[in-house]
Amino acid sequence: VWYRNLGTNSPLQPITNYQLPITNYQLPKEVPMTRKILIILSEWGYWGEELIGPLETFDAAGYQVDFATPTGKRPVALTPSMDATFVDPPLGRPVVSQEMAEKVRAIDDPNNPRLNNPISLRDWLPEKPYWSSPKFLREMEAYYRRLEEIRAKDLSQYDSMLIVGGSGPLVDLVNNQRVHDLILNFYQMDKPIAAECYGVPCLAFARDINDRKSIIWGKHVTGHCLEYDYKDGTGFMGANVNPNLGDINFGPPFYPLEYILRDATGPEGQFHGNVGHEVSVIVDYPFVTGRSTPDSYATGQRLVEVLEKGLRRYGW
């Protein structure tokens, strides 16, 4: 481990004064050492604390973790997420403590091997064929056969999956068929699925090809609310970004996530923005969703409680 793990008796640290948003959390007793979590990260930039928070929680619980990215490239943290002077425009305050900035820089350091050689989703999971393919039927049969093999041999070893947020998922996770297939298989296997910030819309678009119905229909979720959206400064970075282009700024996000989640949950579900609350984490099994950066530790903590205490509902 390249950074100090949080102790199980860490004192409450309020988000005011820009301290780490750590709750007075204690791990469940007799936590088994055999849990394994699959963590999905964007190759276009993830928000540092949204990895560090859950990861430190999993480490403290003795969990094993595997990392995966769309093509197997090493993920890179977004620069503002390791800058303690960065002021989040919608919140009007710094959102990165000095301690967190150091932790993010440590795990982002190329000399730190922890994020090296992530699983390549492209190499691991099959691609769904085009309908226009002359061998469509045979290719679809092979596609489903391969998914069944992966489900039986690979996915059975995982207890849960987590999709880390940041602006990067907008580019290569939200509309990624292989990410959708992972989510659907975890869902069908009744395994908890956690997502943070702009990783949450992956849940809205993971739909069975037959009924095409949202799997969060009728569910309660949180995510990046409209009040938290940038008017400018939505940036990306990583191995896919051409260095000759300089800083990439798409202005506002590609879409208002809140509207997508409100529509995807339907009249019997609900999106919870919890504007004005410092932390917003919702558990509606099998989904654990975190709104944004300050919710990172709490998202990991609720997932541990889902796995160890049978938590099925929280925050609504």
State where each predicted segment sits.
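Aromatic-residue-lined binding/catalytic grooves and analogous aromatic/hydrophobic interfacial grooves
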Residues: 197
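Glycine- and acidic-residue-rich phosphate-binding/metal-coordinating active-site segment common to enzymes
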Residues: 192-193
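Extended, subdomain-level signal for the structured scaffold at the beginning of enzyme domains
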Residues: 33-189, 202-316
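Generic extreme N-terminus detector
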Residues: 5-6, 251
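Short, basic, low-complexity termini and linkers enriched in Ser/Thr/Gly/Pro
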Residues: 1, 8-29
